[in-house]
Amino acid sequence: MALPRPTSPHARGSNRTPAIMRLVLGACVPGLLTLTWLYGPGTLLNLAWASLVALACEAAMLALRKRPPGVFLKDGSALVTALLLAVALPPYAPWWLTLVATFFALVFGKHLYGGLGQNPFNPAMLGYVVALVSFPLEMTRWPSPDSALGLPDSLREFLGLATRPDAWAHATALDVLKTDRSLTVDELFAGNPAFGHLGSAGSEWVNLAFLLGGLFLLWRRLFTWHAPLGMLAGLFAMSLLFWNGSGSDSHGSPLFHLFSGATMLGAFFIVTDPVSGATSNRGRLVFGLGVGVLTYVIRAWGGYPDGVAFAVLLMNLAAPTIDYYTRPRTYGHRKAERGFKAGD
């Protein structure tokens, strides 16, 4: 008599790629709404255009690689990349700048290495850095929060049909702190409209919004606390170490750096990338610390006011080495074994 031999059931998890991407998109909504409230609908135009370009690039690359477009287009990863670029680019970036950044992010940052799960660099940060290095003037045209445009003017800016005076775009607080050494930090906060209560005017509210969205993702356990805390701790420690009060040669207080630029966006939505970052918990902590330290170094002494994107890409290069030296202990062994043995 033949006995039935059924296989054991497989455990099914709810963390499928489309569900994860939807949660990330939802967590970015507070930051997106805050940007729209402060700077007008330009960010929404960037998002709509970047999403169309991202889906088109995704479909074209899938067709070239002979992969089923319908399956991969539904996973939402291209839309997440588009959203991260839309909130990182200036609100009134011209259409071609968003096109270039999104194209490089999807084609060279993602599909050149084999698609989702194979990319060694964060695609959104790669596209952003390409745009920043290639078109620095357009990438630094941030308006002040009190000069937001309406939808018709935003469309003209987006299409490149409007000419604004140079005074319309102002330097951010990170720009001013890097270039203006004639005033103390207290004088800059008191007399320069680029500065807010904690950090850059407007940027502090955007950072608080992304902090709220990031804490939601942490509560949903989409990532562990190691990478975000590592980045914030590294940035805080460096800014505290080199902060000399409010002198004219100061690089800003720890709170200023935590709530300026793309700090919270980077801490909760960029360094937590499970593909291009480290994999072990200790490795994620080291990875985040490296991003935080490099962000401060670039802000204080580098050629760019904000260094989050460059710091992430540099640490992406170091991620395999970090994984090698922070490999967790295998069950049954006293310590983790590294490298290959003879005959393997």
Swiss-Prot record:
It comes from the Bacteria. GO terms for biological process: electron transport chain; transmembrane transport. It is an enzyme of class 7 (translocase). It holds the Pfam family NQR2_RnfD_RnfE. InterPro entries: NqrB/RnfD, RnfD_bac. The modification FMN phosphoryl threonine is found at residue 172. The chain crosses the membrane at residues 23-43, 44-64, 77-99, 120-140, 198-218, 222-242, 252-272, 285-305, 306-326. It is found in: Cell inner membrane. Its cofactor is FMN. GO terms for cellular component: plasma membrane. It is a multi-pass membrane protein. The complex is composed of six subunits: RnfA, RnfB, RnfC, RnfD, RnfE and RnfG. Belongs to the NqrB/RnfD family. This is Ion-translocating oxidoreductase complex subunit D. It comes from Pseudomonas aeruginosa (strain ATCC 15692 / DSM 22644 / CIP 104116 / JCM 14847 / LMG 12228 / 1C / PRS 101 / PAO1).
